[in-house]
Regions:
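Catalytic-core helical/loop segments in enzymes performing group transfer/polymerization on anionic/lipid-linked
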Residues: 1-535
Length: 535
């Protein structure tokens, strides 16, 4: 082998190198999360707290990716002779040089997106200005409850997080954060919010607060990082480079604004009964929870987690010092008792509350759909563009597709396929629209990756799941939910994908219905579960 290029997308790695990478990506997760917890949560620095480093999300971590690359190269060189290795940064070149004498080239694919930074700044300035002009100031006279909510480019009148549970409840106010909305849509939202129980953060944020949050772009270069060792590897330079790249910048700015919002509410003597956060333990959430737990020490803070297990989205996992630093809610609200084990992997002191499963309650009313399609499959896409591209490309190579069988693609509601997939699709690939459950209930076979709510809706509808990429996490996620292995298959190659497409399509529907009742036992039934004291 003449050269090894580690700067390409993972889907373009050789099979052998990809297998090493996936193994380290899986096996080093706990050590990495504990390292971040130990080095960045014992004493809180606000700018570090809202940086991508502290988010400790391996799915998007530049640091963790390069650690895995380092160990994969080391392992690979034990088996193969390589003339040239191409890496992304000086850190890898310097550390690989200790055990490799060949040519090492640096190809910096990761650069600061100056246009993206300008776009983010402009969006925040516009949202701040338009909100100040259009939004009515709401007078808060008594103790109230605040509800953290995100407004996406779906119908903003339908709350996809709490299913309008808090709408028009006098003592509850929604605190919205806009996600991927254009200015026209934001104006429409603001006019609607004026008539409903919504409070804009901008009502309590000043121009100084806006500039402070945006100035994070410049302050991040002044953050001091001491030597930080992962095993015997000093990763300080990797951490500094991730900070330099301003990863997840928009979330960092929102996290700071959430913190300042809590601070300003306290300074204006606003009395609170409770605070509810839609909690994925992201840096947006950390700013929110650290703010309210710092300035409202006696107010109960709740984090609602209306989803299942996704160990690759490792920000969800609360770690020990993080818990003690109060950057997470005091109470975690889960939609099924089976989730306690997964959520308390790193710290056992978490206070759990069994809560309503708003996203899944409609499934209790659904009947098993016996008329399933025997000769077509469906791909469910998520928000990971690279993974989606790899899934589509793999399915295109199957014999099932080569034989002309129809493959449907269900796009993620927040990400259209045309925005990232620029290759031609075969004529037998078709985009399908409609309500997710009403679509997937007709299919025996669902192709996907990750552990989004769509996976569990698929299982509840009686579908079998095929994961065409083996990164070990899909298997771990479903094991933690006690999903029988007969209901899914993690495949290692194209032949396995074809084998299990054929196997599942040819199974009698009696093999599909069993798991619906089993998984429903893992989801809280609203008839037996209260949410904030109400059904």
């Amino acid at each position: 082998m003449k050269y090894l290029d580690t700067t390409t997308p993972q889907s373009q790695y050789s099979r052998e190198f990809r297998n090493y990478y996936n193994w380290y990506y899986f096996s080093l997760r706990k050590k990495y999360l504990n390292l971040i917890d130990k080095n960045f949560y014992k004493k809180i620095n606000l700018d570090i707290l809202v940086s991508s480093i502290s988010e400790k999300n391996i799915a998007s971590s530049y640091v963790f990716h390069n650690i895995c690359i380092y160990y994969s190269i080391k392992k690979f060189l034990n088996k193969r002779k390589i003339n040239t290795i191409i890496v992304e940064n000086e850190f890898l070149k310097k550390n690989i040089r200790y055990f490799y004498n060949g040519i090492i080239q640096i190809k910096n694919n990761e650069k600061i997106g100056k246009i993206n930074i300008f776009r983010i700044i402009l969006e925040h300035v516009l949202i701040f200005g338009v909100s100040k002009l259009i939004s009515k100031k709401k007078e808060i006279k008594s103790r109230v409850n605040l509800v953290d909510i995100f407004i996406t480019n779906n119908n903003f009148k339908i709350d996809r997080y709490y299913k309008n549970f808090f709408l028009n409840k006098k003592s509850f106010y929604h605190i919205p954060t806009f996600v991927n909305l254009n200015l026209r849509k934001i104006v429409s939202c603001l006019l609607y919010f004026n008539k409903k129980n919504y409070i804009l953060k901008t009502q309590f944020l000043t121009l100084k607060d806006l500039f402070y949050s945006i100035n994070f772009i410049f302050r991040v270069d002044k953050i001091k990082i001491k030597k930080t060792f992962f095993q015997k590897l000093d990763i300080r330079d990797l951490i500094l480079r991730e900070l330099y790249l301003r990863k997840n910048l928009n979330a960092s700015i929102i996290g700071l604004q959430n913190y300042l919002f809590a601070k300003n509410l306290k300074n204006k003597n606003i009395e609170l009964e409770s605070v509810l956060n839609w909690n994925e333990n992201s840096i947006v959430d950390k700013g929110w929870n650290y703010g309210f737990r710092s300035f409202y020490k006696n107010v109960k803070t709740f984090g609602y987690q209306g989803f299942f297990v996704e160990k690759k989205l490792s920000s969800i996992d609360i770690t020990n010092n993080e818990f003690d630093a109060k950057t997470c809610p005091e109470y975690i609200m889960i939609v099924g008792s089976i989730l306690k084990k997964a959520r308390s992997e790193f710290v056992k002191k978490i206070k759990f509350i069994s809560s309503r499963a708003f996203r899944f309650e409609h499934l209790f009313l659904k009947k098993f759909h016996t008329k399933k399609i025997n000769n077509k499959i469906i791909i469910l896409l998520n928000l990971d563009k690279e993974t989606c591209i790899e899934i589509i490309d793999k399915i295109k190579r199957t014999q099932f597709v080569q034989n002309g069988n129809i493959v449907y693609i269900k796009e993620h509601p927040l990400l259209k396929l045309s925005r990232f997939y620029h290759k031609p699709l075969p004529k037998n690939f078709k985009i399908i629209n409609g309500n997710l459950y009403d679509v997937i209930k007709k299919f025996k076979v669902v192709i996907t990756s990750g552990s989004s709510s769509s996976v569990y809706e698929s299982l509840l509808s009686g579908s079998k799941i095929i994961f065409p990429i083996n990164d070990y996490y899909d298997n771990l996620n479903l094991q933690m939910l006690d999903v029988p292995k007969s209901y899914y298959k993690v495949c290692n190659n194209i032949n396995e994908i074809d084998t299990y497409i054929s196997k599942f399509l040819n199974q009698n529907t009696k093999h599909f219905e069993y798991y619906k009742d089993k998984l429903k036992n893992s989801i809280n039934d609203k008839r037996n579960t209260k949410f904030f004291g109400k059904n």
